[in-house]
A protein has these predicted regions:
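Helix-loop-helix "hairpin" substructures at the membrane interface of multi-pass membrane proteins
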Residues: 115-123, 127-134, 138, 215-294
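Cytosolic-side transmembrane-helix boundaries in multi-pass membrane proteins
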Residues: 1-39, 43, 260, 264-267, ...
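Hydrophobic core segments of alpha-helical transmembrane domains in multi-pass membrane transport
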Residues: 30-43, 71, 123-127, 156-159, ...
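Loop-to-transmembrane alpha-helix initiation sites
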Residues: 145, 172, 221-228, 269, ...
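Short loop segments and helix-boundary regions at transmembrane helix junctions
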Residues: 19-22, 75-80, 129-183, 195-196, ...
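Transmembrane alpha-helical segments in multi-pass inner-membrane proteins
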Residues: 273-280, 290-356
């Protein structure tokens, strides 16, 4: 081959086109939206970006974020889980009953009271079990995820009501003689007591830079935020660094191809619904702990919030595309938007309209991105065919 032919055969670097810019902006839309929301409300309210308000927002975001993490796994497989809100309510009632009433064993004539950590583990296991039932129904009987989880929504809510005949389990503080104290700390406790941090900040305020006092304030982050961070890290690692995560994406991208490649699709689906149930159980525990009470109506409409944060984060409802980081950003968009509107005095009725509009806009943008990616893929295929003909 001559030098001229060799030079001609070398591919020229592709130019950065306007389409590339549009795709980049679409992929980063969640991050851009969060920055815009923060910038707008920081301008409208000086108190919006204070450490104290950020901690409050983060603790509120933790609920939607943890639910969203479980929902992300499900939606990545092109599924949906409408039962997560009811499962959260059911698990809250299970935990409340175990703390206040214990486990009654009529055949032995005894009542067993569990340590608070055992209550937490049993409750989480029950959440995962409900998820496993969802996954089994979907895979074994070929029921669509929408119908299967819609049915479980009613079943779980009914079981939550039956657990206490529709009554609330109040005052979930436990008793020293039963060794089940400490449950309220799960939802509102901190690694360092806020009173200590407050004293340190007060003592340092006159001598230390503002940055130091702000960092000290963040030491009072509640356990719920740290739990959210832990769930986020574990979920992100599982999805991006393990064969299981790659199989989840493969199923959502093309389930038939995934089956032909040897992936045990049914097994993976059951596991992702178990993860969703586990996350819902964690949310139920956090809410019951924070309120120091368990109510059977806990978690109503939470499934809609979970779907919203996943969609806002850029995960495709068609499956196969999305990530945990985007879901967390989506949760913070909803949290920052809600907190900001309250701080500037937006009517609660208008808040619902605005949040709903944002979600619809996010879905529209997601569809635009999907269409653009298809168009780009088609153009690339055409260029390859032309190059092959030459």
């Amino acid at each position: 081959m001559s030098q001229v032919e060799s030079a001609a055969s070398i591919k020229k670097p592709r130019k950065f086109t306007m389409t590339d810019v549009q795709q980049l902006l679409l992929q980063a839309r969640a991050y851009i939206a969060l920055v815009v929301v923060i910038a707008v409300f920081s301008f409208l309210s000086e108190a919006f970006l204070t450490p104290a308000n950020i901690i409050i927002v983060a603790s509120q975001v933790a609920i939607n974020a943890i639910l969203g993490i479980g929902m992300t796994f499900v939606i990545l497989t092109a599924g949906i889980d409408l039962s997560v809100g009811s499962v959260a309510g059911l698990i809250a009632m299970i935990a409340g009953g175990l703390i206040n009433e214990g486990l009654v064993l009529p055949m032995f004539g005894v009542i067993v009271y569990f340590h608070v950590w055992a209550v937490i583990l049993i409750s989480l296991a029950c959440g995962a079990l409900v998820g496993a039932v969802n996954g089994f129904i979907i895979t074994r009987f070929n029921v669509t995820p929408f119908i299967a989880t819609l049915g479980m929504l009613y079943v779980a809510r009914g079981l939550a009501l039956l657990r206490s005949d529709g009554n609330t389990y109040p005052n979930l503080v436990g008793k020293p003689e039963f060794g089940n104290e400490g449950f309220p700390a799960l939802g509102s406790g901190t690694f360092l007591p806020s009173s200590w941090v407050g004293d340190w900040v007060h003592n340092l305020s006159g001598s230390a830079p503002k940055l130091v006092t702000d960092v000290m304030t963040f030491l009072a982050l509640p356990y719920s935020v740290w739990i959210m961070i832990a769930f986020t890290i574990v979920a992100a690692v599982v999805l991006t660094k393990t064969p299981f995560g790659r199989q989840v994406y493969a199923i959502g991208g093309n389930e038939r191809a995934a089956k032909l490649s040897g992936i045990r699709v049914d097994r993976i689906k059951v596991i992702v619904y178990m993860i969703s149930g586990l996350c819902a159980g964690m949310v139920g525990l956090l809410i019951a702990s924070k309120l120091v009470a368990a109510h059977p109506a806990t978690g109503v409409f939470f499934e809609l919030n979970a779907i919203a944060v996943v969609v806002l984060g850029g995960t495709s409802l068609m499956g196969g595309r999305g990530n945990i980081g985007g879901t967390i950003i989506g949760a913070f968009i909803i949290g920052a938007l809600s907190a900001g509107m309250v701080m500037v005095g937006v009517s609660s009725f208008w808040q619902q309209v605005i949040k709903g509009s944002v979600i619809v806009l996010a879905v529209i943008v997601d569809q635009i991105q999907a269409q653009m990616q298809k168009r780009v893929a088609l153009q690339q295929q055409q260029r390859m065919e032309l190059a092959a003909q030459e």
